[in-house]
Amino acid sequence: MPSFKIVSDFALTGDQPQAVEKLAKGLVSGLTDQTLLGVTGSGKTFTMANVIARVNRPTLIISHNKTLAAQLYSEMKEFLPENSVEYFVSYYDYYQPEAYVPQKDMYIEKDSDINEEIDKLRHAATRALFERRDVVIVASVSCIYGLGEPEEYRSFVLPLKKGQSFRRDLILRRLVDMQYERNDLDFSRGKFRLRGDTLEIQPAYEELALRVEFFGDEIERIVSLDPVSGELLAGIEEINIYPAKHFVTSAEKMAEAIKSIQAELEDRLKELEAEGKMLEAARLKQRTNYDLEMMEQAGYCSGVENYSRHLAGRKAGSAPWTLLDYFPEDFLLIVDESHMSLPQIRGMYAGDSARKKTLVDYGFRLPSAMDNRPLSFDEFKARVKQAIYVSATPGPYEKEHSLQVVEQLVRPTGLLEPVMTVKPTVGQIDDLLEEVKKRVAKNERVLITTLTKKMSEKLADYLVEMGVKTHYLHSEVDTLERIEILRDLRLGVYDVIVGINLLREGLDLPEVSLVAILDADKEGYLRSEQALIQTMGRAARHVDGQVIMYADKITGSMQRAMDEIIRRRKIQEDYNRLHNITPQGIRKAIKDINERIRSVTAEVSGPEFRPTPTLREDIARLIKELESQMKKAAKNLEFERAALIRDRVVELRAALEIDPLGRK
């Protein structure tokens, strides 16, 4: 059985060795809930990787947003390069859920845009769980949403072996049942084609395609091939082909499901008619019968997930199958930034339920649609035998349920918690400007957090007028643009960034020496003990880190936050003194803040975002792939994307020292 193997230039240091030891022992002794209280910059991800390697169990890591999940995924791949590290987040680039607004009599149809590359990574994640145990899946909270039944999915797996006798027409039928589409012209993900005695399949979870060559009904050869160039690569003795969709249903189950849906429809129509809701009854009858007709003819309909309870043969009210059900029973759960992730998991069920209830009440959906939902928090916990919560500021749930809290307060660099100062609000802007100028003179950076958007905008404008290179970071800035702005802060394009609630978890900004918190004494979500500690942590990566809180009184949250920072700083100072350590500022390549995300973005966005390869043949192959994508984009009327790809092709041709127009 393969084991986890850490590959790193670094050894465990600071508080990391004792944290790994305690957490691993806790897992071995059967502790159900543990917390790793780790400060910013203490190497929590490296600790997690070492705990996983020590206990050698399949692991699910949940992060509360896609950006942090991408960072974690990239870091885990670096620490565990010989193991299966996978990425599982929502595959929607855009998602508008189905909804009805009774006050306006307005029905909003479901609208979505699926990212094929992310869907491929999701399929790769579930495939890994069926084939090996040395698996780490980094996921967002989308992992608690419905997925196909694991055993049904497994029953559709198609094993192929060199020398095996297998009628070709049966293989084709199996592929269609597995939701693969036959297309002899457009050979892309989730499709297959047949040319004479040669069958080519593009699995839903792989970059490479497969060629299966027959001699009569015998499989003569299996080989992987590059789907763009057609180049044959490695020979394969045997392989399992997994379904192209997570929701796969046999013909028998589909027939049973249709009967079950018809029975539910009859019962629901009687209820609505008895209540005098004739319009709702007529609407439900028309919509459901149309869906049933589509399912009978095509085995699928728009919004088929709303019938998932019937298709899976589940009882009313029962929990859906999710990614958690694909893991073996002894899997380990790690919840990153648990103070944010756990409340998010808890809130998913209620929000989904309220929207669906309106659709059911007004005849847009059958009551069984309520069972197409995320797990409730209790259902989620029931599927987890052992969990580790990771946070610099554990929330109430972690504090109450953890049987062991392991602290990781000492940084490998010896850096201390920032020095804190409380200043009055009178004259705060002038004082802040002076503090900013001191940092700018030393080529250091500043983060300023306010309570309102208006205040942030005004302050940013004022600082710009005063000659300070400032940028305002607001909630409407998308993830990748936000990363660019933070990168520009590190590069010195800006010296100051002003924001509201955007300066907290997951920011790696070693150049920031000052964090200024305005209206620190306004109790609330943005100025709670947790929020203050997280915000202060942004200055903890600089050797001269300082936090200034502008307030007219010291609130309970402020006092508790300051007491905790002082406690941590004392532990750090004592450790440094005992081990004769001088704090060292972090010198991290500027690209690092962005590169971790960029590498995953390239992986999940498409070939036009990939970096330029170094080998000429790889550049030529990428050009060929891009030209295919460009034609496809133009055919789909995606002209902006086609133009973007065209520009990238011109760049690559220049790299090959070929005239952009292709003239030699």
Curated annotation (Swiss-Prot):
HAMAP family recorded: UvrB
SUPFAM superfamilies attached to this UniProt entry: C-terminal UvrC-binding domain of UvrB, P-loop containing nucleoside triphosphate hydrolases
Any one of the GO CC terms: cytoplasm
Record note on domains: The beta-hairpin motif is involved in DNA binding.
Name of the protein in its database record: UvrABC system protein B
Biological process according to GO: nucleotide-excision repair; SOS response
Binding partners and assembly: Forms a heterotetramer with UvrA during the search for lesions. Interacts with UvrC in an incision complex.
Record's function text: The UvrABC repair system catalyzes the recognition and processing of DNA lesions. A damage recognition complex composed of 2 UvrA and 2 UvrB subunits scans DNA for abnormalities. Upon binding of the UvrA(2)B(2) complex to a putative damaged site, the DNA wraps around one UvrB monomer. DNA wrap is dependent on ATP binding by UvrB and probably causes local melting of the DNA helix, facilitating insertion of UvrB beta-hairpin between the DNA strands. Then UvrB probes one DNA strand for the presence of a lesion.
Ranges where the UVR domain occurs: 620-655
Family of the protein in this entry: Belongs to the UvrB family.
Stretches assigned to the Helicase ATP-binding domain: 25-412
Positions of ATP binding: G38, V39, T40, G41, S42, G43, K44, T45
Compartments (UniProt record): Cytoplasm
Keyword Cytoplasm part of the UniProt annotation: yes
Chief site of localization: cytoplasm
Location of the Helicase C-terminal domain: 428-594
Classification via InterPro entries: Helicase/UvrB_N, Helicase_ATP-bd, Helicase_C-like, P-loop_NTPase, UVR_dom, UVR_dom_sf, UvrB, UvrB_inter
Keyword Mitochondrion among UniProt keywords: no
Keyword terms of this UniProt record: ATP-binding, Cytoplasm, DNA damage, DNA excision, DNA repair, Excision nuclease, Nucleotide-binding, SOS response
GO molecular function, one term: ATP binding
Motif window: Beta-hairpin: 91-114
Phylogenetic lineage: Bacteria, Bacillati, Chloroflexota, Dehalococcoidia, Dehalococcoidales
